[in-house]
């Protein structure tokens, strides 16, 4: 269980996060949305222990997070800067496993399984510059899942890919969640994406930020890019989230 307790974060005079309290249960897909600049990235940085909060705390299974916990992996928007250009897909995915004290054969197994899960087995020995943007982001996702995190933090991971690739990567995330069962915290600007992927949607207010609303997504677990997005419940929920964000923006 990941718990955020009365978290606040200021940068000098700028109060980015005012007071956030929220819990993330094991195995849940949580989408985090909110107006531009409301502090979504700041929240993820505090959650991951990369940035100390000004007040409150983040606790993972009751223990205060002060540095990136071993059980967490992160995927960022900018895949082109997160992969090592001189390493192949296989080497990039294996990189974080080097310090886990695993046998070489186990590393090979985890890497090959993760690369297969993201559909890149055919490209495992290619370098990042030989891959499309979507394939590079798949490599980042494979690197995160090979690490076998309990919690996966993703900061607008699909913002830089085209619409078709984005839809494919969304479906990839649903299959990864079903296969590995990790807790996922997924920051997105895209309201449709948040409703399509989420078990829950955490709507943040504008800065100084609090949690404005937490919605449970009542859609069936099995989702489909066409039929789910035609479902009246989907349409109702996306309008609701959109109104919430407009209201947050208006202050
Ligand atoms: N290192 C920093 N120093 C000073 N101010 C910062 C820093 N990082 C973030 N901020 C400020 O904190 C607020 C929240 O920024 P943050 O990037 O977390 O928002 P966001 O919701 O992720 O933004 P976006 O929607 O544009 O992705 C903004 O006002 C930003 O200018």
Task: Label every model-predicted segment.
Residues 98, 105-123, 175:
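Conserved ABC ATPase "signature" region
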Residues 146-150:
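A short, proline-enriched helix->beta-strand linker immediately N-terminal to the Walker B motif
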Residues 152-155:
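Catalytic Walker B motif of ABC-type/P-loop ATPase nucleotide-binding domains
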Residues 127-131, 135:
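Conserved ABC ATPase signature
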Residues 48:
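Helix-to-loop junction immediately C-terminal to a conserved catalytic motif
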Residues 56-68:
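Conserved ABC transporter NBD signature motif
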């Amino acid at each position: 269980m990941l718990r955020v307790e009365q978290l606040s974060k200021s940068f000098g005079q700028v109060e980015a996060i005012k007071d956030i309290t929220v819990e993330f249960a094991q195995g849940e897909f949580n989408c985090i949305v909110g107006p531009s600049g409301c502090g979504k990235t700041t929240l993820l940085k505090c959650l991951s222990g990369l940035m100390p909060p000004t007040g409150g705390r983040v606790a993972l299974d009751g223990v205060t997070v002060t540095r990136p916990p071993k059980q967490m992996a992160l995927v960022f928007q900018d895949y082109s800067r997160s992969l090592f250009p001189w390493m192949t897909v296989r080497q990039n995915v294996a990189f974080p496993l080097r310090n886990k004290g695993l046998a070489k054969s186990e590393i090979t197994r985890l890497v090959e399984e993760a690369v297969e899960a993201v559909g890149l087995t055919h490209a495992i020995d290619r370098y990042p510059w030989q891959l499309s943007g979507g394939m590079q982001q798949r490599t980042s996702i494979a690197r995160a899942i090979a690490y076998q995190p309990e919690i996966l933090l993703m900061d607008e991971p699909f913002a830089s890919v085209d619409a078709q690739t984005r839809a494919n990567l969304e479906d990839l995330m649903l299959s990864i969640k079903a296969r590995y069962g990790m807790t996922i915290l997924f920051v997105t600007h895209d309201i449709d994406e948040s409703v399509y992927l989420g078990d829950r949607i955490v709507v943040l207010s504008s800065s100084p930020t609090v949690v404005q609303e937490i919605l449970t997504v009542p859609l069936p677990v099995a989702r489909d890019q066409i039929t789910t997005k035609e479902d009246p419940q989907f349409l109702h929920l996306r309008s609701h989230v959109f109104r919430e964000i407009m209201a947050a923006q208006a202050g």
